[in-house]
């Protein structure tokens, strides 16, 4: 249980029974001193995964946490950021429950690494559901470049009014995840 004790004493993010919670940023709705939201990018799982096989409980914690996150995957195939964002709502009409490519791609990378370590098709269904969603969003929401490349918007919501921007850091992370 040393891995868990070390994690619990590290930082302001917390694992709860249904996912990884981070303090809500000032521009999220709701926000405040003691407001947290469930974040798709469950970085503590990455930490446990990296401690295998030196830490005997790391494998069990990784599997349980990834199973919990798989249950949070919505009907579209992504892990929603549940609170609203003032600027996404104001600039693009994107409300609560939006898709954030960065957080989802970070979680995808964790699933890919875990699937490679554990083998036996573990997490394939979750990975494939997400990749199906991502392929659909890329196909329907991309912005084409002059040379035929695709820029995938950083955020998405089923009721979005205006397609948002594409950031290099989000795009590069997506390309690396697809490569892996």
Describe every region a protein language model picked out.
Residues 2-34, 59-81, 122-148, 180:
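Long, well-ordered core segments of solenoidal/helical folds
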Residues 20-49, 88-108, 155-172:
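Solvent-exposed loop and edge beta-strand segments that line ligand/cofactor-binding
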Residues 42-59, 105-120, 172-180:
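Well-ordered alpha-helical scaffold segments within catalytic/enzyme domains
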Residues 49, 61, 66, 88, ...:
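Generic detector of leucine side chains in alpha-helical contexts
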Residues 67-123:
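Substrate-binding cleft of extracellular glycoside hydrolase catalytic domains
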Residues 123, 127, 167-174:
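Hydrophobic alpha-helical segments and helix-packing faces
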Residues 141-163:
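Flexible internal linker/loop segments at domain or repeat junctions
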């Amino acid at each position: 249980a040393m891995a868990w004790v070390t994690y619990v004493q590290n930082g302001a993010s917390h694992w709860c029974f249904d996912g990884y919670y981070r303090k809500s940023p000032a521009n999220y709705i709701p926000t405040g001193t003691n407001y947290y939201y469930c974040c798709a990018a469950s970085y503590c799982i990455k930490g446990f995964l990296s401690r295998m096989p030196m830490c005997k409980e790391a494998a069990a914690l990784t599997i349980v946490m990834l199973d919990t996150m798989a249950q949070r995957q919505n009907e579209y195939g992504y892990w929603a950021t549940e609170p609203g964002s003032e600027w996404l709502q104001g600039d693009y009409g994107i409300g609560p429950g939006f898709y954030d490519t960065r957080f989802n791609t970070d979680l995808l990378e964790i699933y890919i690494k875990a699937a490679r370590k554990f083998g036996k098709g573990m997490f394939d269904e979750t990975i494939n559901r997400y990749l199906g969603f991502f392929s659909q969003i890329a196909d329907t929401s991309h912005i084409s470049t002059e040379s035929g490349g695709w820029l995938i918007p950083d955020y998405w919501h089923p009721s979005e009014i205006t397609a948002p921007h594409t950031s290099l850091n989000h795009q590069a992370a997506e390309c690396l995840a697809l490569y892996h």
